[in-house]
Amino acid sequence: MKLLENKVAIVTGATRGIGKSIAEMFADQGATVIFTYVSSEDKAKLLESELLSKGVKAKGYKFNVADFEPCEGMVNDVVKEFGSVDVVVNNAGITRDTLLMRMSEEQWDEVINTNLKSVFNMTKAVQRTMLKQRSGSIINMSSVVGVKGNAGQANYAASKAGILGFTKSIALELGSRNIRCNAIAPVFIETEMTGALDEEMVQSWRDAIPLKRGGQPEDVANLALFLASDMSAYITGQTLNVDGGMLT
């Protein structure tokens, strides 16, 4: 039996990078995969086709998870169509990096709303269903930047640190109903976005990591799969770093 067979999973921000890798891995392990996106329709259609080709059910929803009502509406639709929500991966996120002296209110609000408010929105939306089921796994994508901070990323660091406190609080609130909530804190993950950066700078980041390489989206997806599955049934309220030993 596959690790996520008969489970319904929602992954936000899933058409590229870490989110895409998680959606693909969940499908490989038998999950029905529901995903959200805000940008490319073409990428979403390709992902949906790819997931369906794995022999599972899949569906994409286009909306901004920073908006509360669409999150509720989507979860209601998913429960009606697929019967449950067993796993949520709050992965959607953006950066608007700049020093505090140059940061606009808009840049602050945009990052906080997309990265942190969306986690509240989706968790609130699935709470009722998971409480009725007396089961569920909520996985929140934080960052090593949320653990240690980073110059030029005050907005991003605040949003990712907020996720850590939210995760612990939800684990305490919902644990008695067998609903688990954990956070993943990746460091330098090599994706399409990092591929556009200066290679010399990227190599300097790799050199600063004890394992001497950047992480791959699959490294994060492997942990998300573990946290989504029953293998992690006694793990909740934790922040698990995927950092190649950087914070050691």
Task: Mark where each language-model region is.
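Active-site helix of classical SDR
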Residues: 123, 159, 167
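Conserved glycine-rich cofactor-binding loop
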Residues: 8, 15-17
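Conserved glycine-rich Rossmann-like NAD(P)H-binding loop of the short-chain dehydrogenase/reductase
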Residues: 29-46
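Substrate-binding pocket helix/loop in short-chain dehydrogenase/reductase
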Residues: 99-100, 104-112, 194, 201, ...
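Residue(s) in the substrate-gating loop at a strand-loop-helix junction
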Residues: 143
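C-terminal substrate-recognition "lid" of short-chain dehydrogenase/reductases
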Residues: 179, 214-242, 246-247
